[in-house]
């Protein structure tokens, strides 16, 4: 059985920092919550392809591939998270999609979670899962 995901999200990472973004909120009040770049999976599109496309559209970033971190639930839907290393600065992004981007370490993401400033609430868990995957790959 094929799992149907609503969105594909991506953790860009470098050393001990992870990229989060504040998405535009035209349809509701701006609550300035930080989340992962990504978005809707189009009809007929593989989730990993959607993740790569969303990186190009939102951050003007091209990565050769992504690794799957796992599925996460938000508002009664499943969302799949991928990850890719990124070592360059991101100086520009689509300001029709995103308000702000920033690199955060795990402690800062934990603070955002305690302040209820994470979009879906599971971003920290996704980062921690990625760290375990990276650690296992090194062993």
Segments predicted by a language model, with ranges:
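A generic fold-level signal
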Residues: 3-5, 13, 29, 76, ...
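Short secondary-structure boundary/capping segments
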Residues: 2, 10-11, 26, 71-72, ...
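Unchanged
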Residues: 40-122
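Conserved N-terminal beta-strand and adjoining loop/helix that marks the start
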Residues: 1-20, 40
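Residue-level signal for short segments within beta-strands and strand-turn junctions
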Residues: 12-14, 22, 85-86, 105
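Conserved Nudix-box catalytic region and its N-terminal flanking loop in Nudix hydrolases
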Residues: 17-53, 57
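Charged phosphate-binding loop/patch that engages nucleotide di/tri-phosphates or the phosphate backbone
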Residues: 118-139
């Amino acid at each position: 059985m094929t799992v149907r995901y609503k969105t594909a999200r991506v953790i860009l990472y470098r050393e001990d920092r992870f990229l989060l973004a504040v998405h535009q909120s035209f349809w509701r009040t701006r609550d300035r919550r930080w989340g992962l770049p990504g978005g809707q999976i189009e009809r007929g599109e593989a989730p990993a392809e959607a993740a790569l496309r969303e990186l190009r559209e939102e951050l003007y970033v091209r990565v050769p591939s992504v690794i799957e971190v796992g599925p996460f639930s938000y508002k009664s839907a499943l969302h799949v998270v991928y990850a890719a290393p990124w070592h360059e600065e991101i100086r520009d992004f689509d300001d029709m999609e995103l308000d702000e981007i920033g690199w955060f370490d795990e402690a800062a993401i934990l603070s955002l979670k305690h302040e209820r400033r994470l979009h879906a609430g599971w971003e920290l868990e996704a980062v921690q899962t990625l760290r375990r995957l990276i650690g296992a790959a090194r062993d």
